[in-house]
């Protein structure tokens, strides 16, 4: 009699290529796969890995955040590299002169960067200018700012938990009784 070996956990889920069928993304992957193999630079390995990522793991980054990162001492004239989208931020009054490389830059963000005398590069241009990632600053948007992430963590109702409950309605009767009023068992 044989034994039933559970193969439930055998498959290691790692992206070796992007899920997207975008041909331009595929060409970038070819370029950076070559650079990652031949240059030995860690920068190229990271960019390649991020090109494979899902949209959730390539969150957008605002122009304000890019500016904040580039204002740190010693980062003048370096190229900001974002494997994702850069969006405009209306709260940012003055846009400094930036050199930026991103997969996509929204129309308004692009206009503001160029108006400030900045430069926007594509990843194939970056591969020519900085094949080993020299003179670049790699950055990414906040991954846990999605609304869905607020529901992750210790169960709502557990002490010191700030996890958002999944509630069908925000009325008086929903998640506002037990533990919150004396008439319903206890008030904490």
From Swiss-Prot:
Name listed for the protein in its UniProt record: Large ribosomal subunit protein eL18
Gene (name only): RpL18
One GO term describing the cellular component: cytosolic large ribosomal subunit
Family that this chain belongs to: Belongs to the eukaryotic ribosomal protein eL18 family.
UniProt subcellular location: Cytoplasm
Cysteine pairings via disulfide bonds: none
GO biological process terms, semicolon-separated: translation
Domain of life: Eukaryota
Keyword Cytoplasm found: yes
SUPFAM superfamilies the UniProt entry points to: Ribosomal proteins L15p and L18e (SSF52080)
Primary localisation category: cytoplasm
Region ranges (Disordered): 152-188
A GO molecular-function annotation: structural constituent of ribosome
Keywords of the record: Cytoplasm, Ribonucleoprotein, Ribosomal protein
Compositionally biased residues, Basic residues: 161-171, 178-188
Pfam families: Ribosomal_L18
């Amino acid at each position: 009699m044989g034994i039933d070996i559970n193969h439930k956990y055998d498959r290691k889920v790692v992206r070796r290529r992007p899920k997207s069928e975008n041909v331009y993304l595929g060409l970038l992957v070819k370029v950076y796969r070559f650079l990652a193999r031949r240059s030995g630079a860690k920068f190229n390995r990271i960019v390649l890995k991020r090109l494979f990522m899902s949209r959730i793991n390539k969150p957008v980054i605002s122009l304000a955040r890019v500016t904040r990162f580039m204002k740190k001492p010693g980062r003048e004239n370096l190229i900001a590299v974002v494997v994702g989208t850069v969006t405009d931020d209306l709260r940012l009054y003055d846009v400094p002169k930036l050199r930026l490389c991103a997969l996509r830059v929204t129309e308004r963000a692009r206009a503001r960067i160029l108006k400030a005398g900045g430069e926007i590069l594509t990843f194939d241009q970056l591969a020519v200018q900085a094949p080993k990632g020299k003179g670049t600053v790699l950055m990414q948007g906040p991954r846990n700012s999605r609304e869905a992430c607020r529901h992750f963590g210790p169960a709502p109702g557990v002490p010191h938990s700030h996890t958002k409950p999944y509630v069908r309605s925000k009325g008086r009767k929903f998640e506002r009784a037990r533990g919150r009023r004396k008439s319903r068992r206890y008030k904490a």
